[in-house]
Amino acid sequence: VRLLRAHPGEYLSGQEISTSLKISRAAVWKHVEHLRAAGFEIAARRAQGYCLRSLPDLLLADDIMRDLATKVVGREIDCLKQLSSTNLIAREAAAAGAPEGLVVLADSQSAGRGRLGRNWTSPEGVNLYASVLLRPQLSPLDAPQLTFLSAVATAEVLDEVCGLNARVKWPNDVLVNGRKIAGLLNELGAETEQIHFLVLGIGLNVNMSADQFPADLRYPATSVMLETGTTQARLPLVRALLRRIDELYHDLLAEGFGPLRRRWEARFDLLDRQVEVDQGQQIITGVVAGLDADGALRLFLPDGRSQRILVGDVRPIGR
């Protein structure tokens, strides 16, 4: 692929490719057929050779890393066709000593997960399934701040790359027109006073069609394609996302949670509104005051008291 891409619009003879790759002409033909089966459009002409006409929407580490210019995120990138869960692979890599900034991407997942262990539908070749390994010098109590970092990065990139008006939902969703377009799942490896690693997991619906969503979804869902009416190449989206995560991560460590919290709250439509929080065993009503430093949602209750919300589904009351 690299050889053909280095000569766009040009024909390379089978002999040139054979010599460059140190393989037989028969092996060249087999490689070309394999690439065609994977979606690469490769023209062939007698006495001229092969020419790459178009690429499938594949995520390749070399393409993502080329001129990425990040400080931490993307130092190492693993792109896999199919796996159980990008978060699981990233956690295993973290335990084995992988460097901060490792990114694990998959074309599909067989065991993608959301918050509270809920299944995350992960069809092949249409979405972004990504995990970023970080080793922040933060207290474990501050680890939830990274969930809001993921949300802000995802929402801002959806606006800038896709022309959407993305909003955030506490604690870990990104919405467009009231429908869920991305979910976030961060997983922590820590002791009482030290974070060993933190994995940022992001599932972003890019080119998913309406019939690919399960019928039993808890909340309405959407994708970039459904919102814009056109397919979106995933490469520019993932590159922009990794750059924004890197930028926000650097700012968080240098400036604290305040600036990031303000960017998140600016996209949170329930700020200063009356809501109810369904915690399963009880429903709490109040007015949203904002986020605490540990990511808890703070409510003003009807009796004037303030209460921190650590878990629950938040819904607006009235308009």
Model-derived regions, located:
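Hydrophobic residue at the +6 position relative to the catalytic HRD Asp in the kinase catalytic loop
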Residues: 50, 173-174
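Long, positively charged amphipathic alpha-helical accessory segments at protein N-termini or as interdomain linkers
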Residues: 1-23, 33, 37, 138-144, ...
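Alpha/beta catalytic cores of group-transfer enzymes, especially the acyltransferase/condensing modules
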Residues: 168-172
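Residue-level signal for inorganic ion chemistry
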Residues: 28, 86, 130, 173, ...
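N-terminal lobe of the biotin/lipoate ligase/transferase fold
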Residues: 1-160, 180-182, 189, 232
